Amino acid sequence: MSESIQVIDSVHSQEIPIVDGIGNAKVVVWPGTGARHRTFQVINLGENSKTVQLCHPESDAAYYVLKGQGSVFDIGTGQSHDLGEGGMVHIDAKDRYQFVASASGMDLLGGPCPADISLYAGLKT
């Protein structure tokens, strides 16, 4: 794909199976859309839902809380950090983490950078 500006419809984006409970995770910007240096997933966590445990061996990750409240759990240290609308979180490469929504649910935008190709196994390009 040539370098260009793209407008990507997240509504019709493919899903990746990283949500445990109510919700979904849609891949919006990833190597399958031509992105080489960045990824974005829209993660919708319903009431008291969570992601599976995540870890990116060669990628940092950053997320922005679009809506709702919850926490990010650092599996390595056992610490939980509260998150709310407008909050951001940065996770170093190799750190294991999990997002947990409160009763209000939580929507996030973000992902690993550079891409963690293992997240996209089985997706159509």
Question: Where are the model-predicted features located?
Answer:
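A short beta-strand-loop-beta hairpin characteristic of the jelly-roll/cupin
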Residues: 50, 56-85
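Short proline/glycine- and basic residue-enriched helix-capping loop/turn segments at helix->loop/beta transitions
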Residues: 44
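Ligand-binding loop in jelly-roll beta-barrel domains
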Residues: 84-85, 93-119
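General detector of folded, globular domains
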Residues: 37-38, 64, 71, 83, ...
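A short, N-terminal "cap"/entry segment at the start of jelly-roll beta-barrel domains
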Residues: 1-39, 52-53, 119-125
